[in-house]
Swiss-Prot record:
UniProt protein name: Protoheme IX farnesyltransferase
Subcellular compartments: Cell membrane
Transmembrane segments annotated in the record for this chain: 25-45, 54-74, 118-138, 151-171, 177-197, 230-250, 280-300
Family: Belongs to the UbiA prenyltransferase family. Protoheme IX farnesyltransferase subfamily.
CDD domains, alphabetized: PT_UbiA_Cox10
HAMAP family for the chain: CyoE_CtaB
Native organism: Staphylococcus saprophyticus subsp. saprophyticus (strain ATCC 15305 / DSM 20229 / NCIMB 8711 / NCTC 7292 / S-41)
Amino acid sequence: MNKEQTLAHNSSRVTFKELQQIIKMGLVQGNLIPAFAGSWLAIVLANHSFLSSIPQILMMLVGSTLIMGGACALNNYYDQDIDSIMPSKQQRPTVNERISNRNLLILSFGMMLIGEALLFALNIPSGVIGLLGIVGYVSFYSIWSKRHTVWNTVIGSFPGAVPPLIGWTAIEGNISLVAVALFLVIFCWQPIHFYALAIKRKDEYSLANIPMLPSVKGFNRTRVSMFFWLVVLLPLPFLLSSLGVTFIVLATLLNLGWLYLGLTSFKKDTDQTKWATKMFIYSLNYLVVFFVLVVVISLIQMF
């Protein structure tokens, strides 16, 4: 049995857990939260009926899941060479030959095509934004910037921040300041989140010759960059003034807590890995808490 036959044989036994790894389901699920929040705010602020908007929300969530999962699968296809070098990636089905390249590409493009069809069925802006997200993530991030510049994380933050725009346009069919504010929050959140992870894995990235900021410029430059994005994030809740003073205060406190944690990195003899772990965990909690606040406070305003 040749290698291609072996790969095809292995791919027939791909488990659901492995499929989740291929499409990076954890990343996808995290992006569905701001996507839903975008739709929810469009419903509340434009006085749409939630019940009558459920079909659009479901189509948006399914379409977004498919295009993000498909783009991530294509990213895994392209990154097989570097993933095979990095110790933390050894259990990926694309590395241990649990799925053939042919089946991986069929899965990837199939998901993206169906997802885009659903988004375009909603309206043209949703489909176009989804397409821009795919092109940005696959071409400008995965293929180009990830391997060639320390700005890769910032460049990848543009396509990574489109979910709330898709969510909003799925309901309203246009882009508003509120939608842009949600986009900016996700955009600023990503460098902090991924730099924290990159600090923990800087040796792996160096081994794979990936120019992540901590690997190329070191910890000092990285923590300054993270602090910069924390400062930029600080005033963004004020762009969501339509949610009221309570939201602005709570979101600002959330930002200040993260800013304080960022400042602790400038203490003498900081344990870099321990600090990066704290920043990474805070970033995960931040994403959930911020968008839950968006939904809950806007819900309270309805009554």
